[in-house]
Structure formats: C-alpha cells, structure tokens
UniProtKB/Swiss-Prot annotation:
Organism: Arabidopsis thaliana (Mouse-ear cress)
Taxonomic lineage from the root: Eukaryota, Viridiplantae, Streptophyta, Embryophyta, Tracheophyta
PANTHER family reported for this sequence: DIHYDROLIPOAMIDE ACETYL/SUCCINYL-TRANSFERASE-RELATED, DIHYDROLIPOYLLYSINE-RESIDUE ACETYLTRANSFERASE COMPONENT OF PYRUVATE DEHYDROGENASE COMPLEX, MITOCHONDRIAL-RELATED
Domain of life: Eukaryota
Transit peptide: first to last position: 1-102
Stated name of the protein: Dihydrolipoyllysine-residue acetyltransferase component 3 of pyruvate dehydrogenase complex, mitochondrial
GO CC, alphabetical: mitochondrial matrix; mitochondrion; nucleus; pyruvate dehydrogenase complex
Length: 539
C-alpha cells in the first residue's frame, strides 16, 4: 500500500504535464517494459498538434520499471525560431538527463538518477567542478545542484524537480564523466535517503566491465618469443646460411651491432633464412665480453643530457581546442588572402567618438570593435562567406554572428556577438567587454559562445603581431586574422614628395569547399572599404 500511495502522489504531480508543455518546449520520453508498449495517447496527439517531433519510445528490459514521463526542459521558449539559426548554434538544452525508477523490492524506493548533461554541441564528457548541495539536502526546481566544467566553460546545473539529494555518485573533482553517466540520485521522501547509501547505479555498474577489460595478452607473447631462442638450435645454423656477400639482419640487430662495434659478418643468424636477430647480437656480446664494456659508456652518455620537465594535465578546454583545430586542419582545405588596410581615417573617427563617449561618461570604443562591425557589414554584402559546409549542401546564414577570440589563463574562448551587423559600435563594445570578462572568470554560458557564423582573431593590438594566419573555426567557413598597425612611408603627389600612413594587415582564412578565391577577395575588398571609409559604417 505504501508504494501504491507513492505512485498515486507522483501521478498527481504529473497531472499538469499538458500545461507544462504549453509553457515550455519539451521532449517527453516514456519508458515502457517489453510487455507494456502503449499506443499513441492524448499527450502524443497534443504534442503533434504543437509541432513537436514524434515521441521516442524506448523499451527497458526490466520488470520493476513503470511507465513514467520524464521531461527534459529546453532553455528557450520558442523552438521554431531556433530552427532558423545555424544547426551548430541552436540553443542546446542544459539537459539534466534523468531516469525515474520504482522498485518492487523494499530496499529501493522511488528515485531519480541524474545524468551528466549535454551542455554544448561538442560536449561528450564533463567534469564536476563543485557540488553546491550535500547528500541529504532538500532541492527544489531551479536550485543549482553543482557546477559542471564543459568543453567550453563552467556551467551551473539546475535541479528540475523537488526532492532530496540521496546520493552523490560522482564526487567533486571527478573528471571525464561521459554524457548521460549517472552523477547523483534524488528521492521524493526524506526517510528514503539512507536506503541509497551503498546504492550503485545500473549505468555505472554496466560501464565498469568495459573499462576493466584487460589488453589481450597474445601480442605480448609474440615479443617474448624472439629473444627466447635456446642455444640448442645453433646446430641448425649452417643449414640456412645467407647466400652471397649480403648480410641479412633485422634493423634492431643492425643498430645494436653498430653501437657495440660488432661486425655482422662474424655472426651466424638464427632467424628465418639465417637472418641475424637481436638475440644473436646479445649472445655474441655475452660470449665475447664486449657487452660489459660497451653498455656502461652508452648509459653514461644517456644520463648526461637529462631533461628537467613537468607534465601539465590537459584541461577540458585544451582537449577540445586541440581536437577541433586538428580536425579543422585535417579536413578543411584552407587558403589565405592578405591585404593592407589604411587605418588613418579609422583612428581619427575613433578619437572623435571616444571624445564624445568620455564627455558622456561612456566606455571607449576600441579598434577591435570597429573591426567586428566592419566584418559584420562585409558579411552582409558578401553572404557567401557567412556559410557552412555540409555533405549535402552549403548552408548560408541570415544571421551575422561574430565570434571574438579571447585568450585566458584557462585557454582560448570564442564568445559570440550576435547580429553584429545590426548593432551600434557602443553595443558591440559593451558586449565584447562583458563576454571577455566572463571568459576570464570561466563563467560563460552556452548561449554566450554558440551560434557563431564568422570569427575574428586579433593579435595585433594586444601583442603587436604584424601578420598571421588563423585556423578556420569549424563548422564556419572563414576567420579573419588582424595584425598590428604600423606607419609606412608612401609616395606623395610630386616625384620628390612622400607622406606617412598607418596600415593594418589582415588575413582571411577560408574553407575552399565553401568560399572560392574570388569570393574571398570580394569580401576583403568590402571589409577594406569599411575600414578605410569608416563613416560608412555609421550610415
């Protein structure tokens, strides 16, 4: 009766599911046993009328699992608008992957297994940075359970339902937790907390055997076979002598013989067809006594150039940066276009605007803010560069979202300024400063870095780098590398006249599958036009 009452209470909590679906975009997944696969019901019909995708029914081979709806809430209230955005930039849900179970036994009351959420498009695993709740604490919807370190940033993970935190499966500091792997258990009733003290989630138990699988032993046995040749087969050496003057030996045997000044012609091989192997060299050195004199000198030489070093573990952001950039260089056919842009008028306009900003107490506008604005307007003129490659088609985006590279102590981040072509310089400057600060504090949220269609990387202003080539940020088709401005002598009007002008080199890296050379040159021409005539950006 106690379990029946719990099921009835839980059913009451779910009576407003239809209302919840009206307020939030959600995907409902019902778990049925193999013997209880239900047909479409009223909620399925309701979801289809709202335009949600068909519900996925997953059978779990368990006789102790009852059909219960589990709701994964998304971060946006309008899913249809997100579908028009880049596929890699849509608002990914901070999914708290969970599974609710009811046990027929007395040791397992109703509980919920909370899995590692998928917090970014590229996330496959995460780390538990900090638990904000302890075992036994009461939790409510919207409260933060823990902080998860993703491949992009550290994100707070919120609780979805009311209850009590019965068990923390993955302790604080746990690393490389696969998406969906159970990290905590919650229960509805406080008295059920103690029953999960020694509980091991089924997903964790299932994963253990795969990790514990030892490396097969046969390959190691093959290595032992060669040096284990006994001395007895020496009698068979003359039966397979090498023909001619050529001496057949393995590369390792040749190297060992060379290091110890051993003539190969003095050794008869015991390998296939009389081939000299390492065991033959070792036996020769042992019998002649050369091994004792030659090896100490080698070890003495090897100790002399000893290196002092420290091994730094890979952070999550470093792993993702390495894998994405390696993927980019290996799969994207890069080409590079460089042009010099005169920035005298740009610097003059910036000085005028900053004088107005200072008078009104506002923040100054940086050269990088003007570069971001010019890049966004050039993308509006040449939309082919605002695209992405897929195997079946080229996707051209209507939104101009500019990622801005920010270097921090934790690694490289690329937060995004969305709809940069429609924003003013002050707004762009404020957003870039805010995003850069959040990146340095490691507090970026998924919506702060997802959805970019083009990237700007500036090493000129902060570091004085004259010119460089950046790696395309997949799945984007282009990235702009901005160098430092320098004064140059340029010809004047007369034959003996000259002037000074400041030039800033920029290099456009393109994906040749999407952007042809002429299209990339057209974009650079448009960008240069905005930089050299900056007032046109204000129109």
């Amino acid at each position: 009766m106690a379990y029946a009452s719990r099921i009835i209470n839980h059913s009451k909590k779910l009576k407003d599911v239809s209302t919840l679906l009206r307020r939030e975009n959600a995907a409902t997944i019902r778990y049925y046993s193999n013997t209880n696969r239900a047909p479409l019901n009223r909620e399925d019909t309701f979801n289809s009328r709202l335009g949600y995708p068909p519900l996925e029914r997953i059978s779990i081979c368990s006789t102790s699992t009852l059909p219960v709806s589990i709701i994964f809430s998304t971060t946006r209230s309008n899913l249809s608008s997100a579908m028009g955005r880049p596929i890699f930039g849509k608002e990914f849900s901070c999914l708290m992957q969970s599974a609710r179970g009811f046990s027929s036994g007395s040791d397992l009351p109703p509980h919920q297994e909370i899995g590692m959420p998928s917090l970014s498009p590229t996330m496959t695993e995460g780390n538990i940075a900090r638990w904000l709740k302890k075992e036994g604490d009461k939790v409510a919807p919207g409260e933060v359970l823990c902080e998860v370190e993703t491949d992009k940033a550290t994100v707070e993970m919120e609780c979805m339902e009311e209850g009590y935190l019965a068990k923390i499966v993955k302790a604080e500091g746990s690393k490389e937790i696969q998406v969906g792997e159970v990290i905590a258990i919650t229960v509805e009733d406080e008295e059920d907390i103690g029953k999960f003290k020694d509980y091991t989630p089924s997903s964790t138990a299932d994963a253990a055997p795969t990790k514990a699988e030892p490396t097969p032993a046969p390959p190691k046995e093959e290595k032992v076979k060669q040096p284990s040749s006994p001395p007895e087969p020496k009698a068979s050496k003359p039966s397979t002598p090498p023909t001619g003057d050529r001496v057949f030996a393995s590369p390792l045997a040749r190297k060992l013989a060379e290091d110890n000044n051993v003539p190969l012609s003095d050794i008869e091989g015991t390998g296939p067809e009389g081939r000299i192997v390492k065991a033959d060299i070792d036996e020769y050195l042992a019998s002649s006594g050369k091994g004792a004199t030659a090896k100490p000198s080698k070890s003495t030489d090897s100790k002399a150039p000893a290196l002092d070093y420290v091994d730094i573990p890979h952070s999550q952001i470093r792993k993702v940066t390495a894998s994405r950039l390696a993927f980019s260089k290996q799969t994207i056919p890069h080409y590079y276009l460089t042009v010099d842009t005169c920035v005298d008028k740009l610097m003059a306009l910036r000085s005028q605007l900053n004088s107005f900003k200072e008078a009104s107490g506002g923040k100054r506008i940086s050269v990088n803010d003007l570069v971001v604005k010019a890049a966004a307007l050039a993308l509006r003129k040449v939309p082919q560069c605002n695209s992405s490659w897929t195997d079946d088609y080229i996707r051209q985006f209507k939104n101009v979202n500019i990622n801005v590279a920010v270097q921090t102590e934790n690694g490289l981040y690329v937060p995004v300024v969305k709809d940069a072509d429609r924003k003013g310089l002050s707004t762009i400057g404020e957003e870039v400063r805010l995003l850069a600060q959040k990146a340095k504090e490691n507090s970026l949220k998924p919506e702060d870095y997802e959805g970019g269609t083009f990237t700007v990387s500036n090493l000129g202003g902060p570091f004085g780098i004259k010119q460089f080539c950046a790696v395309v940020n997949p799945p984007q088709a282009a990235i702009l590398a901005v160098g430092s401005a320098e004064k140059r002598v340029v010809p004047g009007n007369g034959p003996d006249q000259f002037n000074f002008a400041s030039y800033m080199p920029v290099t456009l890296s393109c994906d040749h599958r999407v952007v042809d050379g002429a299209i990339g040159a057209e974009w650079l021409k448009a960008f240069k036009g905005y930089i050299e005539n900056p007032k046109s950006m204000l129109l």
